[in-house]
Amino acid sequence: MEDKKKFMAKAIELSINSANTIGGPFGSVIVKDNEIIAEGSNKVTSSNDPTAHGEVVAIREACKKLNTFDLSGCEIYTSCEPCPMCLSAIYWSRLDKIYYANTREDAKKIDFDDSFIYLEIPKKIGDR
């Protein structure tokens, strides 16, 4: 349990640093064999890339480091509940587990509201 707290603390530290410097308040770490192998923080505004969320940045780094798209055997710790895009990337990369500190409701309170996406998903394509 102590390691899980350490990994989450690192994700939160990345989110704080990101909010104070280059982007939104989101950070993530990917862990394999009880070691951090990749880190990511929100770089949407600094890179002009709307997909550069902390989770996606960490996934890209881990895939590059391990030279594979399959992150089975790895876990992700993230400062906030993943948005639909990040959750999809987590599933596609086959990460074993997700741990998050804040909920999407917490994110909504600080103007990071993705509830409109969740409302769109169940709609028929013609109604989107």
Task: Describe the predicted segments one by one.
Residues 1-21:
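Short, basic/aromatic recognition patches
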Residues 26-34:
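Short beta-strand scaffold segments in enzyme catalytic cores
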Residues 11, 15-18, 28, 38, ...:
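Small-residue (primarily alanine) positions within well-ordered alpha-helices
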